[in-house]
């Protein structure tokens, strides 16, 4: 391994000493070191970049007698490589040449001018347009955890005080930060071990006094009470570290970070990490984004609307007034078909939210200004579309959009319609915007009239009919003469280039003009950059209004999208009730109905104080898990203000949604499937309330029959009697179907199936009462389990069912019985005869004959 030798810098070349000094300032980042047209990496950085980016690993010079590993990439392709590294949660320090090579003695002066970290991205090319890109910080104190998140690409700054590790785990799942800062002495590393973008920070960055001062300076206030941050010490410490890190990486003012919000769990329905995962809200169980609730609901017109929708899905409201306000706006848009008008108008807005953040950071590019110009030019049209609406919420959103006539006039006067990507390319500002700029540009573009006059004069003086004045980027200005007339060229002409049929020359007058032109190009570009910076100064006073515009447009987009989804997917408006319970008629799973190849079977559910728990039985593959999940998703959709996939739905107060559905070994933590299941069950039993919706699926499968049945029974009993939570409890323990006889608020329902011979048809219809059997053997046969195994299982099942539960358990544990399960049946002739019988095809006489034959075989 080639370790960096920083102790003996004098042994290295001056250039390598410069590199090592800069690298020592950013030890945890890859250092892109600019050398001419390439960024070079050395030592372990080179090895890591070669592995991650697939670029060649070479060597340059030696260190301690060993070649120094080196890898390079062209400067013009750097954004593509940065995008790959950011996806891998790798941070990069970009070092540029800031000195003049012509005047430098020794290595050209270089400086790190940009830090690219996963959580501090603002560049459009590096961001996922439909996902928030969050930087987070966590601090552990005696009373719990402080947690802070910042989306630097929008300025959204949120803190939370969390009392338990479960609450922190849920927040990490909800926010999914791109980069996570933690203190040197953070004690719960197991909680954050799965995050690739972890960054350890010194303890002093979490100091309370330092953090408070940083935040007060940022917001320009005397205290933080106005932000509701009283008694939020831990979250302020996390926020302070986060603010320090952003200042270090951005190295510029952050005016768009002008407020901070405290996230209160009591304002929204609490969803723990397991619930977010099991319901596949925005990420499916395989880690992708297909076939999730968000994928079905998201037909938004703007990227900022898509990001807001995902936040809403993860933060379902509890405030009935806020929910109904969204519903009323949605209903009006739907009833008037306004969504058809608004959708194309909103689509043309683009991503105003992130453009505004780049304006604040002064990193906006010419095309950002062009897009902003287009967006604010559309506002009168959108305002007109909303003018006749009755909904108070739509009027509120219209006011948030605002008006920007002065800024529109400025941008229309300043920015060309199709600007280049970068200001350094020039040609961004319109002709007529600045008289001095126009003059320098005219000169830099070669003063065409002067060149025409020069060409005419030289033709006349020399008598050369083929003489032309031209220009190219390599050789500059020249006088071109055909080869056959080159003998007429005056002595004052100096040959510049020889081509096949022509000669090119330069004269003193043309050389002087060239120098003026090149000088004027530099002056024109310098002035354009100066005027460009002044544009930021003229727009930024409206920063807060632009942020409100982006927020209002995003919310209008989400609600308009809900209206379109309701129309397209046949959703209905749910009713919110103050009475406890959930009543759904014709409910459907919003995702499964979209991907199913067959018509989806809608089902009802009723939960109320007299019917708090439903014991759900039925065959595997019968639809129990789908049924339970759809109840949770319809409830959640109601609380984000969306219409729902049901004929009707009345939803009472809900404070939490819990799911214990499916499990897998947690190998990283060394926990078995059963341990994961029991941990999730414990969390539910400790935290559920009478207003919680609980989904419990197959509790107790991972242990012995006795243990599993006992745990499932006790958990169901505790939920129904002690907590009285609204519960759907799916099980294959048929003993649990006796609970309704013992507990008044428990009922049985089952998913129906029809058996025909050895086949089974799943009806997916929910019926009252318990299932008659589980159809496990039929499902096993459908799955392709060998026929001999199925036959042996039928015999064992018949044997077990003929005895009571205790003897059945005993018989399953005896070694001689275990060894006989897969033996050939003793009387194979009898079994063969039975297999050949088709009862539906027999006459009474044939049936009697077969009965005598079977009796003979058994004798």
Curated annotation (Swiss-Prot):
<dbReference type="Pfam" id="PF05188">
    <property type="entry name" value="MutS_II"/>
</dbReference>
<keyword id="KW-0234">DNA repair</keyword>
<dbReference type="GO" id="GO:0003684">
    <property type="term" value="F:damaged DNA binding"/>
</dbReference>
<dbReference type="InterPro" id="IPR000432">
    <property type="entry name" value="DNA_mismatch_repair_MutS_C"/>
</dbReference>
<dbReference type="InterPro" id="IPR017261">
    <property type="entry name" value="DNA_mismatch_repair_MutS/MSH"/>
</dbReference>
<dbReference type="InterPro" id="IPR045076">
    <property type="entry name" value="MutS"/>
</dbReference>
<dbReference type="InterPro" id="IPR016151">
    <property type="entry name" value="DNA_mismatch_repair_MutS_N"/>
</dbReference>
<keyword id="KW-0547">Nucleotide-binding</keyword>
<dbReference type="Pfam" id="PF01624">
    <property type="entry name" value="MutS_I"/>
</dbReference>
<dbReference type="GO" id="GO:0030983">
    <property type="term" value="F:mismatched DNA binding"/>
</dbReference>
<dbReference type="InterPro" id="IPR005748">
    <property type="entry name" value="DNA_mismatch_repair_MutS"/>
</dbReference>
<feature type="binding site">
    <location>
        <begin position="618"/>
        <end position="625"/>
    </location>
    <ligand>
        <name>ATP</name>
    </ligand>
</feature>
<dbReference type="GO" id="GO:0005524">
    <property type="term" value="F:ATP binding"/>
</dbReference>
<dbReference type="GO" id="GO:0006298">
    <property type="term" value="P:mismatch repair"/>
</dbReference>
<dbReference type="GO" id="GO:0140664">
    <property type="term" value="F:ATP-dependent DNA damage sensor activity"/>
</dbReference>
<dbReference type="GO" id="GO:0005829">
    <property type="term" value="C:cytosol"/>
</dbReference>
<comment type="function">
    <text>This protein is involved in the repair of mismatches in DNA. It is possible that it carries out the mismatch recognition step. This protein has a weak ATPase activity.</text>
</comment>
<protein>
    <recommendedName>
        <fullName>DNA mismatch repair protein MutS</fullName>
    </recommendedName>
</protein>
<dbReference type="InterPro" id="IPR036187">
    <property type="entry name" value="DNA_mismatch_repair_MutS_sf"/>
</dbReference>
<dbReference type="InterPro" id="IPR007861">
    <property type="entry name" value="DNA_mismatch_repair_MutS_clamp"/>
</dbReference>
<keyword id="KW-0067">ATP-binding</keyword>
<keyword id="KW-0238">DNA-binding</keyword>
<dbReference type="InterPro" id="IPR007696">
    <property type="entry name" value="DNA_mismatch_repair_MutS_core"/>
</dbReference>
<dbReference type="InterPro" id="IPR027417">
    <property type="entry name" value="P-loop_NTPase"/>
</dbReference>
<dbReference type="Pfam" id="PF00488">
    <property type="entry name" value="MutS_V"/>
</dbReference>
<dbReference type="InterPro" id="IPR007860">
    <property type="entry name" value="DNA_mmatch_repair_MutS_con_dom"/>
</dbReference>
<dbReference type="Pfam" id="PF05192">
    <property type="entry name" value="MutS_III"/>
</dbReference>
<dbReference type="InterPro" id="IPR036678">
    <property type="entry name" value="MutS_con_dom_sf"/>
</dbReference>
<dbReference type="InterPro" id="IPR007695">
    <property type="entry name" value="DNA_mismatch_repair_MutS-lik_N"/>
</dbReference>
<keyword id="KW-0227">DNA damage</keyword>
<comment type="similarity">
    <text>Belongs to the DNA mismatch repair MutS family.</text>
</comment>
<dbReference type="Pfam" id="PF05190">
    <property type="entry name" value="MutS_IV"/>
</dbReference>
């Amino acid at each position: 391994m080639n370790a960096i030798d920083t102790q003996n810098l004098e042994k290295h070349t001056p250039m390598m000493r410069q590199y090592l000094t800069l690298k020592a300032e950013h030890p945890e980042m890859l250092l892109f070191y600019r050398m001419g047209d390439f960024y070079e990496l050395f030592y372990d950085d080179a090895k890591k970049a070669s592995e991650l980016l697939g670029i060649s690993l070479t060597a340059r010079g030696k260190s301690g007698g060993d070649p120094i590993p080196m890898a390079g990439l062209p400067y013009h392709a750097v954004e593509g490589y940065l995008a790959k590294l950011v996806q891998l949660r790798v941070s990069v320090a970009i070092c540029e040449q800031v000195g003049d090579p012509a005047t430098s003695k020794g290595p050209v002066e270089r400086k790190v001018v940009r830090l690219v970290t996963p959580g501090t991205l603002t560049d459009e090319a590096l961001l996922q347009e439909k996902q928030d890109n969050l930087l987070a910080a966590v601090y552990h104190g005696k009373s719990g955890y402080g947690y802070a998140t910042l989306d630097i690409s929008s300025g959204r700054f949120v803190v939370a005080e969390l009392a338990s590790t479960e609450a922190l785990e849920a927040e990490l799942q909800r926010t999914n930060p791109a980069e996570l800062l933690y203190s040197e002495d953070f004690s719960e590393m197991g909680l954050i071990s799965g995050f690739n973008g972890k960054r350890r920070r010194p303890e002093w960055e979490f100091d309370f006094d330092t953090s408070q001062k940083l935040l007060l300076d940022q917001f320009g206030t005397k205290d933080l009470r106005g932000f509701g941050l009283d008694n939020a010490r831990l979250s302020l410490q996390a926020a302070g570290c986060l603010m320090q890190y952003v200042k270090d990486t951005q190295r510029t003012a952050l005016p768009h970070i002008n407020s901070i919000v405290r996230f209160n769990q009591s304002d929204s329905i609490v969803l723990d990490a397991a619930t977010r995962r099991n319901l596949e809200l925005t990420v499916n169980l395989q880690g992708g984004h297909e076939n999730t609730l968000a994928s079905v609901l998201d037909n938004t017109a703007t990227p900022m609307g898509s990001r807001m929708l995902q936040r809403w899905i993860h933060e379902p409201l509890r405030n009935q007034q806020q929910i109904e306000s969204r519903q009323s706006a949605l209903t009006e848009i739907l009833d008037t078909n306004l969504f058809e008008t608004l959708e194309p108008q909103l689509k043309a807005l683009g991503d105003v939210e992130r453009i505004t953040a780049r304006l604040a950071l002064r990193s906006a590019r010419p095309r950002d200004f062009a897009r902003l110009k287009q967006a604010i030019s559309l506002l009168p049209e959108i305002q007109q579309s909303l003018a006749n609406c009755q909904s108070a919420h739509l009027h509120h959103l219209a006011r948030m959009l605002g008006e920007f006539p002065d800024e529109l006039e400025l941008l229309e006067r300043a920015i060309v319609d199709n600007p280049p990507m970068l200001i350094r390319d020039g040609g961004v500002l319109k002709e007529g915007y600045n008289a001095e700029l126009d003059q320098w540009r005219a000169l830099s573009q070669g003063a065409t009239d002067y060149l025409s006059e020069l060409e005419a004069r030289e033709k006349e003086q020399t008598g050369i009919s083929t003489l032309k004045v031209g220009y190219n980027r390599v050789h500059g200005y020249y006088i071109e003469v055909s080869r056959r007339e080159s003998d007429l060229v005056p002595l004052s002409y100096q040959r510049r280039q020889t081509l096949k049929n022509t000669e090119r020359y330069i004269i003193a007058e043309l050389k002087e003009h060239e120098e003026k032109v090149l000088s004027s190009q530099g002056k024109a570009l310098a002035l354009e950059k100066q005027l460009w910076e002044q544009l930021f100064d003229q727009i930024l006073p409206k920063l807060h209004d632009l942020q409100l515009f982006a927020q209002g447009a995003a919310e209008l987009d989400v609600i308009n999208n809900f209206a379109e989804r309701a129309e397209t997917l046949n959703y209905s408006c749910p009713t919110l009730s103050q009475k406890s319970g959930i009543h759904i008629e014709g409910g459907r799973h919003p995702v499964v109905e979209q991907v199913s190849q067959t018509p989806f079977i809608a089902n009802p559910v009723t939960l109320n104080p007299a019917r708090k728990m439903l014991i759900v039985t039925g065959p595997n593959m019968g639809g129990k898990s789908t049924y339970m999940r759809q109840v949770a998703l319809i409830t959640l959709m109601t609380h984000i203000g969306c219409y729902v996939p049901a004929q009707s739905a009345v939803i009472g107060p809900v404070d939490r949604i819990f799911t214990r559905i499916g499990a897998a070994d947690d190998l990283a933590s060394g926990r078995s499937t059963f341990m994961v299941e029991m941990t999730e069950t414990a969390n539910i039993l400790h935290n559920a309330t009478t207003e919680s919706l609980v989904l419990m699926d197959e509790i107790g499968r991972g242990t012995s029959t006795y243990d599993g049945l006992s745990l499932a029974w006790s958990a169901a009993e505790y939920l129904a009697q002690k907590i009285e939570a609204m519960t759907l409890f799916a099980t294959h323990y048929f003993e649990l179907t006796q609970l309704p006889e013992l507990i008044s608020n428990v009922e049985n329902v089952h998913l129906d199936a029809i058996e025909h011979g050895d086949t089974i048809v799943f009806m997916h219809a929910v019926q009252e009462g318990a299932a008659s059997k589980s159809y496990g053997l039929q499902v096993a046969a459908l799955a392709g389990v060998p026929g001999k195994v199925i036959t042996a299982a039928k015999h064992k099942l018949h044997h077990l069912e003929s005895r009571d539960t205790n003897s059945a358990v005993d018989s399953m544990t005896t070694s001689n019985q275990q060894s006989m399960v897969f033996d050939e049946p003793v009387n194979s002739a009898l079994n063969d005869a039975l297999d050949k019988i088709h009862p539906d095809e027999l006459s009474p006489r044939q049936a009697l004959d077969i009965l005598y034959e079977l009796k003979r075989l058994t004798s």
